[in-house]
Amino acid sequence: MLLSDRDITAELDAGRVALDPYDPGMLQPASIDVRIDRFFRLFDNHKYPYIDPAEDQPELTRLIESKPGEPFILHPGEFVLGSTFELVTLPDDVAARLEGKSSLGRLGLLTHSTAGFIDPGFSGHVTLELSNVATLPIKLWPGMKIGQLCFFRLSSPAKKPYGSGEYASRYQGQRGPTASRSHLNFVHTDVTVTDAGQQGE
């Protein structure tokens, strides 16, 4: 069930859902706006010949911080990681989804590539996967509205919420834009087995 503004306010007032800092003026009819922080993670494409999700590639990205009062310039075709200014904490029976802002989408800014879902139990700054699909550079001002969080109540509390220890929970407590940790639970699956259970020729 998608939570309304009344439900979101009730969850925040009860301390079950937390946004830090919280600005009541960011509340929308069925979501709450979030802002972009001053940290960005850039890709150093010359460090590796390719990106391999099965390997640890610690030099693939580097962290930068925008200077006070200055925007970060996202060039056409560029992909960088950012993060929400707000720290988001969810209980074990509420999940969330990050959506972009319509006004920014109309300028060619994509807020996330695929990872818009936030598990129940998560706590941390939400990493943004920012892309510029326009033909001109886009200025990203730290503190500007960058997206909106929608909240969903689960049919029952999660048996093993994010961060419970049952899962890797690789991004629990993350601060700032966090690089991929896909190598930590990468699994090579044998796909030569056919649907009938026979080895492929």
Swiss-Prot record:
The active site is at residue 129. GO terms for molecular function: dCTP deaminase (dUMP-forming) activity; dCTP deaminase activity; nucleotide binding. Pfam families: DCD (PF22769). The record marks 116-117 as: Important for bifunctional activity. Keywords: Hydrolase, Nucleotide metabolism, Nucleotide-binding. Pathway: Pyrimidine metabolism; dUMP biosynthesis; dUMP from dCTP: step 1/1. DCTP binds at residues 101-106, 119, 127-129, 148, 162, 174. The keyword Cytoplasm does not apply. It is an enzyme of class 3 (hydrolase). Its EC number is 3.5.4.30. It catalyses: dCTP + 2 H2O = dUMP + NH4(+) + diphosphate. GO terms for biological process: dUMP biosynthetic process; dUTP biosynthetic process; nucleobase-containing small molecule interconversion. Bifunctional enzyme that catalyzes both the deamination of dCTP to dUTP and the hydrolysis of dUTP to dUMP without releasing the toxic dUTP intermediate. Belongs to the dCTP deaminase family. Homotrimer. This is dCTP deaminase, dUMP-forming.
